[in-house]
């Protein structure tokens, strides 16, 4: 049976691995992406002081290496191993691929993995057999396994690899044969060892195996976890991967340099900065927007809803204009805060006409029982109000952002070099799909849209150069984009409150997520809680709704369920961006954020709704750009607290830092943002249906 297992095993089946501390000269802390669960197994490479429980990082000159498995939790912390995922054998294959590379590169003579048999899904022996085959096939006969260690312990499965031409007892870090367990006896055939408990004679390798197990049985994985340094960026990278991807050499090359473009801005402020601020903050532009919206709304309420006579249109228009202007006068017209206040005002004055609507609606009643008619009326009113609010927010999103479009049309991108302009034009044109697919690990050289791998490499290099030259937009500007995200990645985002963009991030200076490029599909997210709860369908701010007809597919493959996200991103002024202007499609008012960007999630709002068609799993996410200066790359965690309480407490030497540190709070701002309750109504106005794909891809 065991031979059959090894014959069926594909030794090329390795899983995606992320180095969780890229700063280390010798990579030694890794996560392994085994499936789409939000918790993933990982492993640490380390060494121990002889005979003790004290572990340390590998360094040049070490000859004995230990592999310690762990679990990377949804919050990005390290905990005791919970399991190896659905395929323990593929996990072991991936681990020993890294181990063999490390041993060869750093001339390590021995390596040992110890794993609880209870965590192997009953495949402990298969794992040992597979490891044996891998070592024999990949080491060219230079390394062998100490099989005498396989069955020594009922609790642990041991795998020890050592260089074939080096005696185990001569390797620093391998314990001497225990005099507590064995008596050494000289004989004509050499030294033999007698087991003190049984009196049986054993081979030297059996004595070494027993001594190794005796020493390591006393060691705890907890001691390894206590002071582990991990990179928050690397964790976010590992948890933003989808299961199906093509990790080419170029993917790995650009992944390794992504952090270079997340540094604090060095570019000068764009010449249009003051004009932008005036355009969205001036009372004149707000008065104009309020007047245009009010005139259109008054006519709609008269002609479409018949709420009042034609002679009253001008009076109602003036009233609506005052309501809107008073709501938005203190906020930039493209900000979430402005849209939120606008949505609350619109909702309020539409409610004033509810009695008019009910009078008309009740005339359509055809003898239904009161209970049935009440439910019909409630649903019809909610649908009518939802449609109205979505149209209103759609209109304001375009009109309020008008100055941004005019300014972008006049921008010529003259600061960029010819090669940088070429990269920008290729990206803003039809090349963005292939460019971002490569950065996302989705590019297939046999099936691409318009650009070959060589052309993509040139385009990315030109774009990277453009970001180094770069633009800096003024502070206080919100940029918008959308994204369709798989359920596992979204769940990791919810837990971590941080998201990592591998690709170049197309955003707009206008609130395009509320329907600029199509019919508004999700319009109720900006409302205050009472009104939002009346209109949303998921009733779930951060969670995912699985419809009954999706349950089976979701269980088989969690990536089946998608979450539609509208991003409202602040803080883009902190990093160099590319403002294409006329080098792109100027009416999109595009701002390209750099690849490798990390954002902190400040707020997630349920944007689901039903205006006749149900839209589940739509979220408005307010986020903030985090630079490398704001993001501490690694910390030392208190493993005792972590495993006992789930808290991730940072340590400095032997002194705990007082503030609790975890992925829900590590990037929290000094100033807590107060999110108005009417946010819900605007969130549900999110529409990514007909949006250009570059504003969605990710």
Curated annotation (Swiss-Prot):
Swiss-Prot/TrEMBL site (Cleavage) positions: 7-8, 633-634
Compartments where located: Virion
Keywords of this entry: Glycosyltransferase, NAD, Nucleotidyltransferase, Transferase, Virion
Matches recorded under InterPro entries: ADP-ribosyltransferase, Phage_T4_Alt-like
Catalysis performed (reactions): L-arginyl-[protein] + NAD(+) = N(omega)-(ADP-D-ribosyl)-L-arginyl-[protein] + nicotinamide + H(+)
Active site: 481, 506, 590
Record's GO cellular component terms: extracellular region; virion component
Superkingdom: Viruses
Domain TR mART core: 375-628
Post-translational modification: Proteolytic cleavages at the N- and C-termini by the prohead core protein protease give rise to the mature enzyme.
Entry EC no(s): 2.4.2.31
Main EC class the enzyme belongs to: transferase
GO biological process, one term: regulation of viral transcription
Gene3D superfamilies: Toxin ADP-ribosyltransferase, Chain A, domain 1
Molecular function terms from GO: NAD+-protein-arginine ADP-ribosyltransferase activity; nucleotidyltransferase activity
Pfam family, one: ADPrib_exo_Tox
Protein family membership: Belongs to the Tevenvirinae NAD(+)--arginine ADP-ribosyltransferase family.
Function according to Swiss-Prot or TrEMBL: ADP-ribosyltransferase that efficiently ADP-ribosylates one of the two alpha subunits of host RNA polymerase RPOA on an arginine located in the C-terminal region. ADP-ribosylation of RPOA alpha subunit enhances the transcription of viral early genes. Also ribosylates RPOA subunits beta, beta' and sigma 70 and performs an autoribosylation reaction.
Protein name as catalogued: NAD(+)--arginine ADP-ribosyltransferase
Organism of origin: Enterobacteria phage T2 (Bacteriophage T2)
Gene that produces this protein: alt
